[in-house]
Design a protein with these regions (language model features):
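A charge-rich, low-complexity, intrinsically flexible signal that marks solvent-exposed coils, linkers
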Residues: 3, 8, 12-138
Length: 138
């Protein structure tokens, strides 16, 4: 359940989510949002792809980690799982690219999944990234 309230001086209402037991909680990964924007600005995007076919699998993640550090890896995920230590794959959620480019279908998948499970901060960030990408290509 969402509860919107306006904090004094806040530009928009703060959204609080009643936590459902057994459902992971996430915070927004700001460095990932910055990376996504840089990729869009650098025209490093794929506009048409089937996300189910191109999203990174566990072996893709392992290969990436063989030649990149955890900070770099983490910037491909919009969400940080609360209560899970850094530098573990379980910490990072809502992948939006293939470790090379951002995929429009990946952003849509993040938005959909976040909306479905009521992770409002992730949902809004994915929505804003999708709008940013669509404005850049218009």
């Amino acid at each position: 359940m969402y509860v919107a309230r306006r904090q004094r001086g806040a530009a928009r209402p703060v959204t609080e989510v009643a936590h459902t037991p057994g459902v992971a909680r996430y915070t927004l990964n700001q460095p990932a949002v910055a990376r996504a924007r840089r990729l869009i600005e650098g025209r490093q995007y794929v506009l048409t792809s089937e996300w189910g076919e191109v999203q990174p699998r566990a072996d893709d993640e392992n290969r990436y980690l063989e030649s990149h550090d955890w900070d770099d890896y983490s910037e491909w995920f919009l969400g940080l799982t609360e209560g899970v230590p850094d530098q573990t794959k379980g910490r990072y959620a809502f992948v939006f690219g293939d470790f090379r480019r951002i995929h429009r279908s990946g952003i849509i998948a993040c938005h959909y999944r976040a909306a479905e499970w009521r992770h409002k901060e992730i949902e809004l960030a994915a929505h804003e990234l999708l709008q940013y990408l669509d404005r850049r290509i218009a």
